[in-house]
């Protein structure tokens, strides 16, 4: 099972991907973790990424795709993986598609968590209030202002992926506003269907 998770910050991707990992025993691949691991392991793409990051540059798509390519060759990812946080742009999606096609690997689905923006901002504001009421420091990215900025960046950069993957026939939308366990039920219902198809 090979899937990509999409959705704005605060949509519950983290919680759902943990549950998918637990249920289906496939690794969650986060580009940040993969970059750090590749740098630590001293792989050719890791060394390239390291020199770019040390000079303060942004790691180009080709290098990130190279790191993803190396990671999905590892034993634990052979039967499937969850990509979370990548691709972020249509250009990255196209580069990922080309790399997977070269390896003869097909994605099963792109799961997008659809949420109401105003409700999301309200959810974050409530979380910040509750944290402050407990006398704990509020995380900087948990303030409504910062969250709104992250949401705007997502809409500008990543939201077009929804149209891109809809065009490939891979996009599946899940209502992320339901209670967490109901969302999990919708996700597992969808993924169980893919698994049955793969084994039949």
Curated annotation (Swiss-Prot):
PROSITE patterns: ADENYLATE_KINASE. It catalyses: AMP + ATP = 2 ADP. GO terms for cellular component: cytoplasm. Residues 126-142 are annotated as: LID. Transmembrane segments: none annotated. Residues 30-59 are annotated as: NMP. It is an enzyme of class 2 (transferase). Its EC number is 2.7.4.3. Keywords: ATP-binding, Cytoplasm, Kinase, Nucleotide biosynthesis, Nucleotide-binding, Transferase. It is found in: Cytoplasm. Its main location: cytoplasm. ATP binds at residues 10-15, 127, 178. PANTHER family: NUCLEOTIDE KINASE. Belongs to the adenylate kinase family. This is Adenylate kinase. It comes from Methylorubrum populi (strain ATCC BAA-705 / NCIMB 13946 / BJ001).
């Amino acid at each position: 099972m090979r899937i990509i998770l999409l959705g704005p910050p605060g949509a519950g991707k983290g919680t759902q991907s943990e549950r998918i990992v637990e249920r289906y025993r496939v690794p969650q691949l986060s580009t940040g973790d993969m970059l750090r691991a590749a740098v630590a392991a001293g792989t050719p793409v890791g060394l390239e990424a390291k020199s770019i990051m040390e000079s303060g540059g942004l790691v180009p798509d080709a290098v990130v795709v190279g790191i993803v390519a190396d990671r999905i060759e590892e034993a634990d990812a052979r039967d499937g993986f969850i990509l979370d946080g990548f691709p972020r742009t249509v250009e990255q999606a196209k580069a990922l598609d080309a790399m997977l096609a070269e390896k003869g690997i097909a994605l099963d689905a792109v799961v997008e968590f659809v949420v109401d923006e105003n409700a999301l901002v309200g959810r974050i504001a409530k979380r910040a209030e509750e944290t402050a009421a407990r006398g704990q420091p509020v995380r900087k990215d948990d303030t409504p202002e910062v969250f709104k900025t992250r949401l705007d960046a997502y809409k500008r950069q990543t939201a077009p992926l929804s149209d891109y993957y809809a065009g490939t026939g891979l996009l599946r939308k899940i209502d992320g506003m339901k209670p967490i366990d109901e969302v999990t039920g919708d996700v597992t219902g969808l993924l169980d269907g893919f698994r049955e198809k793969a084994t039949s």
